[in-house]
């Protein structure tokens, strides 16, 4: 039988929950319009677990660009237009820059050290200061030297690729790039332990972040229960210990390296005084953990777009060939700046299939008013990037893949990296990766459907897998064929001529930072 203390605790939890529910009912205010709620549960019964983009899209069409929902004790605001997102999340960022409380993935499995989930405050500002120091445009320009080398290897690796392993080779590129910067070591093969282990940890993190997986996220007061009544605590602690052990291993090896890397950069005189050892490991680690998967997903979406839209590929190839002389040389970062259709292809890929359809939710730090509606304190605010990208009022024929729209109207909005103070800190390096990899792959390869037993393997452009806030193409097959023997020869010589010694590569980057 349960002890009197446990019974008392459960009674307190129940009473507190009912009290909070009562207060939320009597203090409703005038929320933005939305589907009619039911007593107590609000709109929980209507909130989609699958096909979320379609349901949200219908709500915006019915109720407008800002939709209000009640999810039990919580209020959720869906923002479906760039204008509203910029007003609330950008211009009013001082009060819209926090995050909803996430007990399992944030507080337990990461001990409050995951930057993306942190509430706005001194701790997040510390993380953001370090990330900005490493990812500002000046620093990122130095990283192009490494991106040049890694993308040469990717283009070369795909010469021997199959119709189904291009994703693994892309993942190697994005993982090796960030791992070399963070810890001073490149990852030459896609089966490297560091890549596989990080993928496992990232997968566990995303699973724990999924809405509805853990009751404690819906009712945080349950976290006051003792461990034997709260099995999620043990699970979360085991996940954290596995992750932190990996970070310690990476850090120890990085500090032994003779040359510059992010870890060494912030473990010397530049170490923030207020950052503990554990926190600093997490600050660096999250850049590798988050950046590898997001860049991979975006580039896989690019391959899908290239297979499905050969006319757009032929046009961009003609532009590249005219500048670099066909197969004479591989395009460079300097060339990318002179290739407007390449830039348009990148923008259209990010719009056509956004990898974070709803972004990472924001949380309101104090009550606000907008267009006569009340947005209560602690409301969850979701920037519905999918709806924004598919809004015919902004993008003519939004379902079509049309890179030329960005040449016809260069002022079209982009939201792929989020809004306001919580915009992706790695957006500059990610965009550089997108541009150089797409440009070089379009120069080097023709993209086609795979064929099996003489039959074309179809690709469903809507078959994407949701993992937490991320969306990536479900596994698909594609044939990447080198455009000519001359292209293949140039690809091979480009890799041969590039520096392969990681210490020399990082020393070159560091020399420009002095």
Swiss-Prot record:
* InterPro entries reported for this sequence: Cyt_P450, Cyt_P450_CS, Cyt_P450_E_grp-I, Cyt_P450_sf, Cytochrome_P450_fung
Principal localization reads membrane
Give the catalysed reaction(s), semicolon-separated.
Answer: asperaculane D + reduced [NADPH--hemoprotein reductase] + O2 = asperaculane E + oxidized [NADPH--hemoprotein reductase] + H2O + H(+)
Enzyme nomenclature, EC number:
1.-.-.-
Q: For this UniProt entry, which residues form the secretion signal?
A: none
Q: Keyword annotations for this protein?
A: Glycoprotein, Heme, Iron, Membrane, Metal-binding, Monooxygenase, Oxidoreductase, Transmembrane, Transmembrane helix
Write out the transmembrane intervals. 6-26
Membrane topology type: Single-pass membrane protein
Q: Which GO terms describe its molecular function?
A: heme binding; iron ion binding; monooxygenase activity; oxidoreductase activity, acting on paired donors, with incorporation or reduction of molecular oxygen
List each coiled-coil range: none
Cofactors per UniProt?
heme
Q: What positions does the record give for glycosylation?
A: 113, 261, 347
Ligand binding (heme):
424
Q: What happens when the gene is disrupted?
A: Abolishes the formation of aculene A and accumulates asperculane C as a major product and 14-prolyl asperculane C as a minor product.
Q: What domain of life does the UniProt record list for this protein's source?
A: Eukaryota
Which Pfam family, any one, appears in the UniProt record? p450
- Localization of this protein: Membrane
The similarity annotation says: Belongs to the cytochrome P450 family.
**Biological role:** Cytochrome P450 monooxygenase; part of the gene cluster that mediates the biosynthesis of aculenes, a unique type of norsesquiterpenes that contain a nordaucane skeleton linked to an L-proline moiety and are of mixed biosynthetic origin. The pathway begins with the synthesis of dauca-4,7-diene by the terpene cyclase aneC using farnesyl pyrophosphate (FPP) as substrate.
Protein name as annotated: Cytochrome P450 monooxygenase aneD
Q: What is this organism's lineage?
A: Eukaryota, Fungi, Dikarya, Ascomycota, Pezizomycotina
């Amino acid at each position: 039988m349960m002890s009197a203390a446990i019974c008392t605790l459960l009674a307190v939890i129940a009473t507190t929950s009912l009290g909070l529910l009562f207060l939320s009912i009597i203090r409703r205010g005038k929320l933005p319009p939305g589907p009619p709620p039911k007593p107590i549960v609000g709109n929980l019964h209507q909130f989609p677990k699958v096909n979320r983009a379609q349901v949200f899209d219908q709500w915006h069409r019915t109720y407008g660009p800002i939709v209000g929902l009640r999810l039990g004790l919580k209020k959720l605001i869906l923002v479906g237009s760039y204008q509203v997102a910029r007003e609330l999340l950008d211009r009013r960022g001082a009060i819209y820059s926090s995050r909803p409380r996430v007990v399992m993935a944030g507080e337990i499995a990461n001990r409050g050290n995951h930057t993306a989930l942190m509430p706005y405050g001194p701790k997040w500002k510390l993380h953001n200061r370090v990330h900005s120091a490493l990812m500002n445009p000046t620093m990122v320009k130095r990283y192009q030297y490494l991106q040049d080398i890694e993308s040469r290897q990717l283009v070369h690796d795909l010469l021997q690729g199959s119709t189904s392993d291009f994703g693994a080779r892309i993942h190697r590129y994005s993982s090796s790039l960030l791992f070399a910067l963070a810890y001073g070591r490149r990852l030459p093969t896609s089966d490297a332990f560091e890549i596989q282990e990080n993928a496992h940890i990232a997968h566990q993190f995303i699973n724990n972040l999924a809405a509805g997986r853990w009751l404690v996220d819906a009712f945080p007061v349950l976290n006051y229960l003792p461990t034997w009544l709260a099995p999620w605590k043990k699970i979360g602690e085991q996940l954290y210990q596995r992750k932190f052990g990996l970070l310690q291993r990476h850090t120890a090896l990085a500090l032994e390296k003779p040359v510059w890397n992010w870890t060494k950069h912030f473990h010397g005189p530049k170490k923030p005084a207020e950052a503990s050892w554990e926190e600093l490991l997490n600050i660096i680690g999250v850049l590798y953990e988050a950046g590898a998967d997001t860049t991979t997903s975006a580039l896989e979406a690019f391959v899908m777009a290239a297979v499905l839209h050969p006319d757009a590929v032929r046009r961009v190839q003609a532009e590249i060939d005219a500048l670099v002389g066909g197969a004479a040389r591989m395009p460079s970062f300097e060339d990318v700046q002179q290739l407007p259709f390449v830039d348009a292809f990148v923008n259209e890929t990010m719009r056509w299939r956004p990898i974070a359809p709803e972004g990472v939710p924001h949380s309101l730090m104090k009550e606000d008013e907008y267009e006569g509606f009340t947005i209560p304190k602690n409301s969850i605010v979701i920037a519905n990037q999918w709806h924004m990208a598919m809004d015919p009022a902004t993008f003519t024929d939004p379902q079509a893949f049309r890179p030329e729209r960005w040449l016809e109207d260069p002022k079209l909005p982009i939201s792929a990296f989020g809004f306001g103070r919580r915009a992706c800190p790695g957006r500059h390096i990610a965009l550089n990766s997108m541009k150089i990899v797409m440009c070089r792959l379009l120069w080097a390869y023709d993209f086609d459907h795979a064929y099996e037993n003489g039959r074309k393997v179809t690709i469903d452009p809507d078959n994407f897998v949701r993992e937490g806030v991320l969306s990536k193409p479900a596994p698909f097959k594609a044939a990447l064929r080198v455009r000519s023997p001359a292209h293949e020869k140039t690809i091979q010589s480009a890799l041969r001529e590039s520096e392969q010694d990681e210490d020399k590569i990082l020393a070159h980057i560091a020399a420009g930072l002095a």
